[in-house]
Amino acid sequence: MANVFAFVETRGGDVRKVGLEAVTAARQLADKFGSEVHALVFGPPGIGAKAAQIGKYGADVVIIVENASLANYNPEAATATAADRIKSGRYRAAVFSTSAQGRDLAPRVAARLGASIVTDVLSLEVEGNAIVVRHPMNIGKVIATIAITGTPAILAMRPNVIAPAQNLKAGRVENSQPAIDPNSTRVRVIETKQGSGGKLDLAEAPVVVAG
């Protein structure tokens, strides 16, 4: 069965909209394969309470990785854990977001697995044994159609191109551990400073106006 993996981004213990978009995109792809979506979510203790929310957006299995050191994004721990899970699960595809975090994580995972990667994906289709995606090039002046036959295909969705869609599934919950100790990594987050309140993240804004 060609199951599909989705990486669910969190911030401050909450699931981000781009994370639910990744689950929705994975659900669309899995439906074409007649398979399941397995969603991985990292976070501090208590993040497991979000499993039901993630399941409602199409995840058949929600893999929870709780660790006090994962309150902030840890690139080494996230890369090792996601790559190990994708490899052991033999997924047909792994869906991320082309957010700031996803731009860092998805290429790391692809490099570790020696897998094909496409970022800023606009749409997903299945044709024969290929996953066919649309990807903007030349500052959006050209839209390329790319067919990926290798497994796993690492796909990072452009934010806001697929609206999160609930399908009222009740995903099974699986508890797991980081592939490496977050406290032993070479890069650790010492401090996080939040911007002024009331401002929407650009990656989640429905409309961006630039002059």
Model-derived features: positions:
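N-terminal glycine-rich FAD/FM-binding segment characteristic of electron-transfer flavoproteins
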Residues: M1-G211
